[in-house]
């Protein structure tokens, strides 16, 4: 018989009745029924109930004093449970093991957190004792699922003819949107490596190298603040790049990969292929976001022109000063009590809006705070444009375009929540396309890249040459696209700019000199000068895919050893101080913030 186990704790069933077995695992739960002591033994594979009967009174006395999570090995006989004691909640619930002997492999101290799920410990405790937290069923299953999802993604890429690469972790710093993590060089004092924010340049260089289809389960490192869906420091993505492809070719690859993955690991309904394509401008108008949650059926409309024809003088004055009016329908809520509308108004004020107007299209006529300012013809125009019917209400927000867009998005989400019309058992995918190539940094009044600076501008270099004003430049679109699911951006991608003259021009408009471009992107520019294929790619975030599949509200629930909100690893004590000797080897010296000032 094996030293530790003949079977796992999750595999025993009625076919094993009468068998002598040896099992090892953690002491999970204990129940004393007076003469009979029941222990739930847990390992990676499941839970089995152990029985210590009164024939083993000495063993009972010993085992009853052992702390939870102590690791034990037991020998015993598998028996069938009586009908009234069968446990349908576990895979081994038809049987139990009558123990004849046991050995303690490792004693456990008093636990700082409970494993059996009776209450959840504070996050600081969970992260400090992550090895204990990972024993809990939900988190344990999430990490197992993570492995399966990565395997599924890898298998699909290989079946599509892709080659898996590993690109360098120590590389050069480049301006890709977030701060770099820097690594000082011992051999080259005063110089630093950077951990890659993404393998962006390397995967494009792989296309320059004559490879046709690249993928990588890629670690990415960004020194940025944490969010619920963003881990500080490190995250993983399915990095993809292909040569001689159009935007639609990329979509044609990614859609089945995501569809098949979500179909395999969830029973939710999934958007049929092809996924909807929504332009950036339409997304910002209809949903107030470039990450639309299509589970919410409400769409926002612009009704500025109609309001300008109304008798609503206050709003007309605002419109003449540059404001816009957005309409947010509230289906079948016209007859809701006044408290509903007051609640929405207070919510809008909480968001920073000066107020929130509304109209109710009831069966008895039109009501609401601003209905009196519109004649029947204008009301009919509003109703048609917003696609409302009798029984619906409409909320209106008036503000500068950026502010109106943000508030309307929040109101849309709140109305959907209040009316309980947001579906929860589906995955709604879409592509957001035609992003602006540039944006205006209002703080410094400077044109900057809105997304990836390596994207191909629609219209090529002619689009730059035709642009005579800032507005013309801001109207240029990129072959840039995002894949969004349930309001979560899973990935950005693009058809790349593979022409040196076009790249220099694009960077020059954003304020970069040729020397700066050569210094920061010299390797790629050189590669472009020796025959570069048209190419494009994308990189779906694996952590966010897992969040959706597990219904997790925080990305830390799908990562084995995450950092906290302050980018600290409480388990390992990182970041940590280093010795003076280590600093000397790197020719570095620490100085206080006061001295920097």
Curated annotation (Swiss-Prot):
GO cellular component: cytoplasm
Protein known as: Aspartate--tRNA(Asp/Asn) ligase
InterPro entries attached to this UniProt entry: Aa-tRNA-synt_II (IPR004364), aa-tRNA-synth_II (IPR006195), aa-tRNA-synth_II/BPL/LPL (IPR045864), Asp-tRNA-ligase_1 (IPR004524), Asp-tRNA-ligase_1_N (IPR047089), Asp/Asn-tRNA-synth_IIb (IPR002312), AspRS_core (IPR047090), GAD-like_sf (IPR004115)
A Gene Ontology biological process term: aspartyl-tRNA aminoacylation
Subunit architecture: Homodimer.
EC number(s) reported in the record: 6.1.1.23
Taxonomic superkingdom: Bacteria
Keywords: Aminoacyl-tRNA synthetase, ATP-binding, Cytoplasm, Ligase, Nucleotide-binding, Protein biosynthesis
Binding-site list for L-aspartate: 176, 222, 451, 496
Catalysed reactions, as listed in the record: tRNA(Asx) + L-aspartate + ATP = L-aspartyl-tRNA(Asx) + AMP + diphosphate
Biological source species: Orientia tsutsugamushi (strain Ikeda)
Stated role: Aspartyl-tRNA synthetase with relaxed tRNA specificity since it is able to aspartylate not only its cognate tRNA(Asp) but also tRNA(Asn). Reaction proceeds in two steps: L-aspartate is first activated by ATP to form Asp-AMP and then transferred to the acceptor end of tRNA(Asp/Asn).
Family: Belongs to the class-II aminoacyl-tRNA synthetase family. Type 1 subfamily.
Compartment(s): Cytoplasm
SUPFAM superfamilies linked to this entry: Class II aaRS and biotin synthetases, GAD domain-like, Nucleic acid-binding proteins
Binding site for ATP: 222-224, 489, 541-544
Stretches for region Aspartate: 200-203
GO molecular function: aspartate-tRNA ligase activity; aspartate-tRNA(Asn) ligase activity; ATP binding; nucleic acid binding
UniProt xrefs under Pfam families: GAD (PF02938), tRNA-synt_2 (PF00152), tRNA_anti-codon (PF01336)
PANTHER family per record: ASPARTATE--TRNA LIGASE, MITOCHONDRIAL, ASPARTYL/LYSYL-TRNA SYNTHETASE
EC class name: ligase
């Amino acid at each position: 018989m094996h030293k530790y186990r003949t079977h796992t704790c999750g595999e025993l069933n009625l076919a094993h009745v009468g068998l002598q077995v040896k099992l090892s695992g953690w002491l999970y739960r204990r129940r004393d029924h007076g003469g009979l002591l029941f222990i739930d033994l847990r390992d990676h594979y499941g839970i089995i109930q152990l029985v210590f009967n009164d024939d083993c009174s000495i063993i009972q006395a010993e085992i009853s004093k052992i702390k939870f999570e102590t690791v034990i090995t037991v020998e015993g006989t598998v028996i069938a449970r009586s009908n009234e004691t069968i446990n349908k909640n576990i895979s081994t619930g038809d049987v139990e093991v009558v123990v004849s002997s046991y050995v303690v492999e490792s004693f456990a101290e008093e636990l700082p957190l409970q494993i059996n799920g009776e209450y959840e410990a504070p996050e600081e405790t969970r992260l400090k004792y992550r090895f204990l937290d990972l024993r809990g069923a939900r988190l344990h299953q999430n990490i197992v699922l993570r492995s399966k999802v990565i395997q599924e993604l890898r298998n699909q890429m290989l079946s599509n003819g892709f080659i898996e690469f590993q690109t360098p972790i120590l590389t050069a710093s480049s301006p890709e949107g977030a701060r770099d993590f820097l690594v000082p060089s011992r051999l080259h004092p005063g110089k630093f490596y950077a951990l890659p924010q993404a393998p962006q340049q390397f995967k494009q260089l792989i296309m320059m190298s004559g490879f046709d289809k690249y993928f990588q389960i890629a670690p990415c490192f960004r020194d940025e603040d944490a969010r619920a869906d963003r881990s500080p420091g490190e995250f993983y993505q399915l990095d993809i790049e292909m040569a001689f492809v159009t935007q639609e070719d990329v979509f044609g690859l990614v859609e089945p990969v995501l569809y098949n993955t979500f179909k395999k690991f969830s029973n939710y309904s999934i958007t049929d292929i092809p996924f909807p394509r929504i332009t950036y401008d339409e997304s910002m108008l209809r949903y107030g976001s470039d990450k639309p949650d299509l589970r919410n059926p409400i769409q926002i409309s612009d009704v500025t022109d109609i309001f300008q024809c109304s008798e609503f003088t206050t709003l007309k004055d605002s419109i003449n000063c540059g404001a816009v009016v957005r309409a947010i329908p509230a289906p079948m809520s016209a007859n809701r009590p006044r408290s509903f509308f007051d609640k929405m108004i207070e919510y809008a004020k909480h968001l920073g809006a000066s107020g929130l107007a509304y109209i109710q299209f009831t069966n008895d006529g039109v009501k609401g705070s601003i209905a009196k300012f519109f004649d029947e013809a204008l009301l009919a125009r509003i109703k048609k444009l917003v696609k409302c019917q009798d029984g619906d209400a409409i909320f209106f927000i008036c503000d500068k375009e950026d502010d109106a867009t943000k508030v309307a998005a929040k109101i849309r989400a709140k109305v959907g929540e209040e009316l309980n019309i947001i579906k929860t058992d589906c995955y709604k995918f879409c592509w957001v396309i035609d992003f602006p190539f540039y944006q205006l940094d209002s703080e410094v009044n400077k044109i900057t890249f809105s997304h990836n600076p390596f994207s191909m501008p629609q219209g090529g270099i002619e689009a730059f040459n035709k642009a005579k004003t800032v507005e013309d430049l801001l109207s240029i679109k990129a072959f840039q696209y995002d894949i969004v699911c349930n309001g979560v951006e899973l990935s950005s991608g693009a058809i790349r700019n593979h022409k040196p003259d076009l790249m220099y021009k694009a960077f020059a408009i954003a304020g970069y000199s040729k020397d700066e471009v050569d210094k920061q992107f010299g390797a790629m520019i050189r590669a472009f000068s020796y025959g570069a294929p048209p190419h494009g790619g994308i990189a779906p975030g694996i952590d966010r895919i897992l969040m959706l599949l597990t219904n997790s509200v925080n990305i830390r629930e799908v990562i084995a050893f995450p950092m906290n909100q302050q980018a600290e690893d409480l388990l390992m004590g990182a970041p940590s101080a280093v010795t003076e000797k280590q600093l000397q080897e790197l020719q570095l010296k620490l100085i206080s913030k006061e001295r920097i000032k």
